[in-house]
Amino acid sequence: MEEIQPNEWTITLNVSTLEFPLSYKFVACNADSKQVEEWENHDNRMLNNPELKKGEIYLTPETEVHFTSSARKVAGTAIPVFSLRSEKSFGVGDFGDLKKLIDWAAKTHQQAVQILPINDTTITHTWMDSYPYNSISIYAFHPMYIDLNQLGKMKDKEALAVFEARRQELNALPQIDYEAVNNAKRAYLKVMFQQTGRKVLASAEFKKFFEENEHWLLPYAAFSYLRDLYGTPDFSQWPEHTEYKAEEIAALCAPDSSCYEEIAFYYYTKYHLHIQLLDAGNYAREKGIIFKGDTPIGISRNSVEAWIEPYYFNMNGQAGAPPDAFSVNGQNWGFPTYNWEVMEQDNYQWWQKRFRKMAEYFTAYRIDHILGFFRIWEIPSHSVHGLLGQFVPALPMSVDEIQSYGLPFQKDFMTKPFINEEMLNKMFGDKAAFVKETFVQHAHDDIYEMRPEYDTQRKVEAYFSDKKDEESIHIREGVYALISNVLFVPDRKHPSMYHPRIAVQNDFIFGRLDWKEKDAFNRLYNHYYYQRHNQFWYQEAMKKLPILTQATSMLVCGEDLGMVPDCVPWVMDQLQILSLEIQRMPKNPKHEFGHVWEYPYRSVCTISTHDMSTLRGWWEEDYEQTCRYYNHVMGHWGEVPVSAPGWVCEEIVRHHLECPSLLCILSFQDWLSIDEEIRYPDVNAERINVPANPRHYWRYRMHLTLEELIKNKKFNEKLVEMIDTTGRF
């Protein structure tokens, strides 16, 4: 058989030479010796005579093979690179630390290591850039991940002593000081660039790297230089080069350019990051470890790609997610959405090139928010919260269709913020008068409307930009809620068509409907969000995902959490994309907790993600829910511990290891939770991200060093026992 593209094999046979009915099996052969190593463990496949005429072709596609070896199960660890800590790291995890993590994984019989996105997010040079999903390049890695120890010895001994003192100071901190770390490592890189840069850039290895990566490396270096030169990443505000022109940027980056020294510094840094991650990826392969990367669903609107390929993006909207367990107001990520119609014209080359680049380093990847390939939650640029969004693409409703459900359509009442005296008093109490004077104006009777100067959430946000006290935040959130208090949102392309506003049943305007109107609205709402789009979104996903998943041989895993349409598992099953299974976020809405023994084989099982509290953190969040879990899932009775002891965590971890999922990848914090002697005393400090807070500081760092972890015989032997006895090695 011939592999015509990653994971797709074909064979052509002359039907006149065959005897029917034909029985056959697939075999796995050694790539070198060509000897058969394994037969399918399955009934014979049968093919009856297709009775072809001369010149006719009969296709018989097979979607799955059944090798015993392919049914293995694997355990692994998920941790951001920035969270790693070694004795030699510089206040943040780096690509050199990855090899130590891989050593620990192999020592404990784990066979997978998963990390968060590692792309450059440098926008403001402040801690606000710590958010790893807001990258300025889909190719360039963040400079803070460079292992300075691999750059060679610094000749300036005085400077080296100063840097070493700073390294020890930053490495001793319990969390990452993002700004201090990046400033110090950048200064170190500048010194080493002056010392070795010319030699590195003249090497054959660098020239090969540059030739293969020039298409992104050159514009990235130019973007980074211009960002700092003009003091903003917003290229629309630059006095020059607001519109990307390849010939102008080539001249800017030419060796005879006055700024070439600074441009070349970015080349030097990206080259070292490339060879270090490539080394870590190859090391994982040698150790038999699946190295799993993460593909963010979005890019920064102030990014290299938005600058050089604006036609691929819709810059007038914001990507996000509807309300879910993470955020009652939805999530607004701020990313531009994709112009899929344009991407389709070149067979999604933008994505294919991106995945092929990832495949140089990784053997598996996670598609962040895979739902975005079916439809994306697009929020107007004037909104802060996600409640006024709409799915794109979608099938909006006409007025006639809305009324066909028995709901009389009243445009002003249903599409403009409903505000009355009762609402203002309930929401703002003794501050209602201030809100009336400042943000709303009287319309008629007891009805108010937003003042034009504050009729969007962005305008309100600007008013409160310098007001950080608790009372101001309460008023700001209340005014946001006034603006989103509508029943329907006009379609972005066809404003005479409408989408029911997400999660409006808990808002004041819904309470103004009578019981018949509420019933009619709920019927159209449920049909719209849970039935109407299934076939439509299935077709949308099948335009993109088959091409993208077959662009490389990497194992594809989808993050399918949130508001998941029925068509998502159809596509993921068909394309054999691994789902994500989390017990506290069950796929079956009738269950409070997922049944781990029912997880599909093609899935990734975990206890918590970076967007959630850890196992120990979750245990302490809701005591009544914890009691139900302790009694009904774990099968224990008696007094429920307020904090999760090690034995409870171990039992939960073991249950997850025993599940049918191909991959059981647990967060580093959840692995450590089973051992009360080494786990971090401060439960809350272990949390990586709080999605409801768009200004969260991503700074979690493991409290042990990797060297200490590798030497901890008792803990490591416990992991080996758990992994081996549950059939994951």
State what each model feature region is:
Residues 1-20, 27-52, 90:
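Aromatic-rich carbohydrate-binding modules that target alpha-glucans
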Residues 25-27, 114:
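Short, conserved beta-strand segments within well-ordered enzyme catalytic domains
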